[in-house]
From Swiss-Prot:
Domain CoA carboxyltransferase C-terminal: 294-533
Entries under InterPro entries matching the protein: AccD/PCCB, AcCoA_carboxyl_beta, ClpP/crotonase-like_dom_sf, COA_CT_C, COA_CT_N
Name this protein carries in UniProt: Propionyl-CoA carboxylase beta chain, mitochondrial
One GO CC term on file: mitochondrial matrix
Length: 539
């Protein structure tokens, strides 16, 4: 119902924008005019972009224009545009002709608000030279990124570009590098979000790759370094744009993109919702929303959610939904490395980052992709002071030559490093298995977890009973009795609890209440670490 209302509101706002653009086209004047009239004519020309014919072509592709996208993303009337009159400076290949000059060039830039909170935005205009990046285009983007860093506000890029403007040669490449430098400078200081709403190829792909989150639109957005024609000429592979760099490819196979949405309107509405979880900068807290879900709410269904059989799967997402405010969970990368779950939720109105093993996929084992996915998310949360809640059910790291040859040792160390490095409040709940090195990695007490809980169903041990018995009781006649002895001594929460490695063994139904209470206490947490230029994470 809420989603339908958002789409309806977005549709109404879009119709207003379309009427204003049609009016802009009719108001253009070719007669000699005063300075004020020239200013107004330039302004109207900028609003029209590449012209009505190209706007219509954009709509026929199922895509909105650059300005329509900004209008739907930002609060009504909040957009303040900058550099509307900037034009490209290229004089080669006939580019100096008036017909090839467009006020604002091929990108719309400025600032506005999302639910009243400041944000800087650029939206590439495919109706002007296919949204290609010129020196002026890059200059406009760099200017708002500099402003965003100065005031401490996020940057959102709406990407829809054919790539570098070939007519400008190396100046276009220099423009990309200028943007990349600012992406790196802003990393960990202000949130950076890329929404791919059309083609994004060649050097252009590295800016989204450097931002914190990359979202795509199904069927109309593409990300690749070299297109299908080049791939065919070099490797003789036949591949379509969609197969090579479409939303499905990057959200399920490569892990380059974090989520994909049905269309432009759906993407922009979800981006507004997602933005509400984030702080404006690393100096500002994430917004605290009024919470009507009692912080001390008990969740009785959690007492029976973990099966008695340790090999039987269950859905960790059900536990997450049951614990967080209003059952609302914005999952990140839901279709990639499904054996680990990451995303944002709220606890008592505060934004939290959620990490959890997924027993339904590969029994929740950690592998290369899930380790990298989890590490990237944990580091973002730590950069922006977002508390971490970790739900653990992990039997270990996935064995096999593919994992070893792929570098599971190095990649698994990334997740370990991320949790150990994080100084935000860290609350861990072991729901069932926590075996071997994977127990250590998943925000254990040994990696400075602030509060670590175990459910009565927890099994905290070096390995499972079957494998342990084969080593400890090798040649033992009664294997079942040996396994029962091992489980009694080790595969339960008590050995860890008596050593202080978990702070308490709690009833699952009390999990929400305990976490909310802990987060209140940990809100003032401060940690001092030794000075260093920067850490050397095992990339």
């Amino acid at each position: 119902m809420a989603a339908a209302m958002r789409v309806a509101v977005a549709g109404a706002r879009l119709s207003v924008v379309l009427r204003s653009l049609r009016g802009a086209g009719r108001s253009l004047c070719t007669q000699p005019v005063s300075v004020n009239e020239r200013i107004e004519n330039k302004r109207q020309a900028a609003l029209l972009g590449g012209g009505q014919r190209r706007i219509d072509a954009q709509h026929k592709r199922g895509k909105l224009t650059a300005r329509e996208r900004i209008s739907l993303l930002l609060d009504p009337g909040s957009f303040v545009e900058s550099d509307m009159f900037v034009e490209h400076r290229c004089a080669d290949f006939g580019m100096a002709a008036d017909k090839n000059k467009f006020p604002g060039d091929s990108v719309v830039t400025g600032r506005g608000r999302i639910n009243g909170r400041l944000v800087y935005v650029f939206s590439q205009d495919f109706t002007v030279f296919g949204g290609s990046l010129s020196g002026a285009h890059a200059q406009k983007i760099c200017k708002i990124m500099d402003q965003a860093l100065t005031v401490g506000a996020p940057v959102i890029g709406l990407n829809d570009s054919g790539g570098a403007r070939i007519q400008e040669g190396v100046e276009s490449l220099a423009g990309y590098a200028d943007i990349f430098l600012r992406n790196v400078t802003a990393s960990g200081v202000i949130p950076q979000i890329s929404l791919i709403m059309g083609p994004c190829a060649g050097g252009a792909v590295y800016s989204p790759a450097l931002t914190d989150f990359t979202f795509m639109v199904k069927d109309t957005s593409y990300l690749f370094i070299t297109g299908p024609d080049v791939v065919k000429s070099v490797t003789n592979e036949d591949v379509t744009q969609e197969e090579l760099g479409g939303a499905r490819t990057h959200t399920t196979m490569s892990g380059v993109a974090h989520r994909a949405f049905e269309n432009d309107v759906d993407a922009l509405c979800n981006l507004r919702e997602f933005f509400n979880y984030l702080p404006l900068s690393n100096q500002d807290p994430a917004p605290v929303l009024e919470c009507h879900d009692p912080s001390d709410r008990l969740v009785p269904e959690l007492d029976t959610i973990v099966p008695l059989e340790s090999t039987k799967a269950y859905n960790m997402v059900d536990i997450i939904h049951a614990v967080v405010d209003e059952r609302e969970f914005f999952e990140i990368m839901p279709n990639y490395a499904k054996n680990i779950i990451v995303g944002f939720a709220r606890m008592n109105g505060r934004t939290v980052g959620i990490v959890g093993n997924q027993p339904k996929v590969a029994s929740g084992c950690l592998d290369i992709n899930s380790s990298v996915k989890g590490a990237r998310f944990v580091r973002f949360c730590d950069s922006f002071n977002i508390p971490l809640i970790t739900f653990v059910d992990v039997p270990g790291f996935l064995p096999g030559t593919a994992q070893e040859y792929g570098g599971i040792i190095r990649h698994g160390a990334k997740l370990l490093y991320a949790f150990a490095e994080a100084t935000v409040p860290k609350v861990t709940v072991i729901t069932r298995k926590a075996y071997g090195g994977a127990y250590d990695v998943m925000s254990s007490k040994h990696l400075c977890g602030d509060t670590n809980y175990a459910w009565p169903t927890a099994e905290i041990a070096v390995m499972g009973a079957k494998g342990a018995v084969e080593i400890i009781f090798k040649g033992h006649e009664n294997v079942e009795a040996a396994q029962a002895e091992y489980i009694e001594k080790f595969a339960n929460p008590f050995p860890a609890a008596v050593r202080g490695f978990v702070d308490d063994i709690i009833q699952p139904s009390s999990t929400r209440a305990r976490i909310c209470c802990d987060l209140d206490v940990l809100a003032s947490k401060k940690v001092q670490r030794p000075w260093r230029k920067h850490a050397n994470i095992p990339l």
